[in-house]
Amino acid sequence: MWVALILSFAMQGLHGADPAARTIAQDDMSAIDEPRQVVARTRTDWESLWRAHGSNQPAPKVDFSTESVVAIFLGSRPTPGYSAHFLRAGLKDKVLTLEWAERRPEADSIRAQVMTSPALFAVIPKFDGEIKFQKVSP
């Protein structure tokens, strides 16, 4: 299965329209306000992560027999307009590396002065090996 995963990532990237990495939730106000990247491979881990995130919505459904959840928490930001997105993935020495970037608001844009804690949740095809997150410049 991981060969198909890597080929899919390499050919299409990890954008929201890519079926290999499906965004299941995105939020500007996570209760997790420290930068963190997380993999949830079980329903128990996912429910615990979702509770820590602090959403008042039910956790999105995930089929853990075929999928894993990957999440990025940016930590506290001074204004709205920040978000994370996946760029691509690569497999080397049995380690799956997920490259991601942070989007920032335009420097000259007018924004509310309110603290945010952006979070991104996506599902990827199940991968039992080590998963690393690598932040890159867009």
Describe the residue ranges of each PLM region.
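Exposed, flexible binding/inhibitory loops of compact, secreted disulfide-stabilized domains
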Residues: 9-138
